[in-house]
Amino acid sequence: MHPKSQSKQLFRQKYQKSPTLNVYAPGRVNIIGEHTDYNDGFVMPCAINYGTAISGAKRDDHRFNVYAADLDEFDEFRLDQPIIPNPSKKWTGYVRGVVKFVQERCPEFRQGADLVISGDVPLSSGLSSSASLEVAVGKFCQLLGDLPLNNTDIALIGQKAENRFVGANCGNMDQLISALGQADHLLMIDCRSLETVPTPVPEDIAVMIVNSHVKHDLVTGEYNTRRQQCETAAKFFGVKALRDVSIEQFQKREAELTALDPDTAKRARHIVTENQRVLDAAYALNHSDISRLGELMNASHVSMRDDFEITTPEIDYLVELAQSVIGKSGGARMTGGGFGGCIVGLAPKDKVDAVRQIIAENYEKRTGLKESFYVCTASQGVHQC
């Protein structure tokens, strides 16, 4: 059952009444531009047809009762008291954190509610189940309290909740695309100015996602380490963020930085070249040059593997299998924060079955893990449903 239907049905069962407010926020897949968001750079994701639905209704007090359908767990907290983490249930941090920072922006918001949350974004897959949940909660609060927040505000509140309440030092891409996505379009986002430029996905091109089922958990260190290394590199170049370093500027001082700290130099090289790849990818898409876009995706994967060092052998193998079928008709790369999760492929629709088949025949045999294969549609951002 789709989360939109499930959340409504479960709400009636749990609370013996009908929901009066229903919202839905999609997950996302990033086509190109990995780890560039927290470097004030460029990204090019699309919202996907998997996401998080919330059904709810006002209460006549200040209490939030939250039922997470997929985990079969409840949480409750009050909006007229300080909102603090519930360490025994990690998922509650995404809900409580968003409500806390909505209140920080709109101190008058104290309206209680009963909620049911249902989602179908695979957890720990790199498809932004957390951002989808944060944006859905933010939109629910905005509509519940008729608050003066737009969808960009809601995205940034979600990011703040993940940074300061949950403790994952993520950038703003995942929340922005969940909030601002457009059907049938990729969205190039400037993560500094927050400007977005929609780019249509050609009709004959499929967006494929393959989940490696190698679990990743970004709160556990490596992601935050990469972020610190990028900040160290920005200081070395005397700039606010690596977004401000051109490839030429990087190459001039690359040997000097490598002598100081070879790992930091590699991390910076990925970010500086990846930003340029996103700009080149937007140009390629606007000129319907899918072959060039594919080259850029493939190069992005090599950079993540060798310079940013965030892939795994299983992920590299999936990419190799997909690329062997796609050839010059598109591309494939790891997507998401890394250390597991998913790969994304762009290719003509008539190649989908062959990609699915080569992975089904080889991946489990080599890794002992069974992949999940999704063909996705670029979808609308957060909305009432």
Curated annotation (Swiss-Prot):
Positions with a binding annotation for Mg(2+): 130, 162
Involved pathway(s): Carbohydrate metabolism; galactose metabolism
Subcellular location(s) of the protein: Cytoplasm
Positions of the record's site feature: Transition state stabilizer: 28
Residues reported in the UniProt entry to bind substrate: 34-37, 223
Enzyme Commission identifier(s): 2.7.1.6
Keyword set includes Heme: no
Molecular function in Gene Ontology: ATP binding; galactokinase activity; magnesium ion binding
Keyword vocabulary terms for this entry: ATP-binding, Carbohydrate metabolism, Cytoplasm, Galactose metabolism, Kinase, Magnesium, Metal-binding, Nucleotide-binding, Transferase
Record: residues binding ATP: 124-130
Active site (UniProt): 174
KW Cytoplasm (keyword) present: yes
UniProt cross-references to InterPro entries, sorted A to Z: Galactokinase (IPR000705), Galactokinase_bac (IPR022963), Galactokinase_CS (IPR019741), GalKase_N (IPR019539), GHMP_kinase_C_dom (IPR013750), GHMP_kinase_C_sf (IPR036554), GHMP_kinase_N_dom (IPR006204), GHMP_knse_ATP-bd_CS (IPR006203)
Gene Ontology terms: biological process: galactose metabolic process
Swiss-Prot/TrEMBL catalytic activity: alpha-D-galactose + ATP = alpha-D-galactose 1-phosphate + ADP + H(+)
GO (cellular component) term, any one: cytosol
Function according to Swiss-Prot or TrEMBL: Catalyzes the transfer of the gamma-phosphate of ATP to D-galactose to form alpha-D-galactose-1-phosphate (Gal-1-P).
Family: Belongs to the GHMP kinase family. GalK subfamily.
PANTHER family referenced in this protein's UniProt entry, alphabetically: GALACTOKINASE-RELATED, MEVALONATE KINASE/GALACTOKINASE
Protein name as it appears in the record: Galactokinase
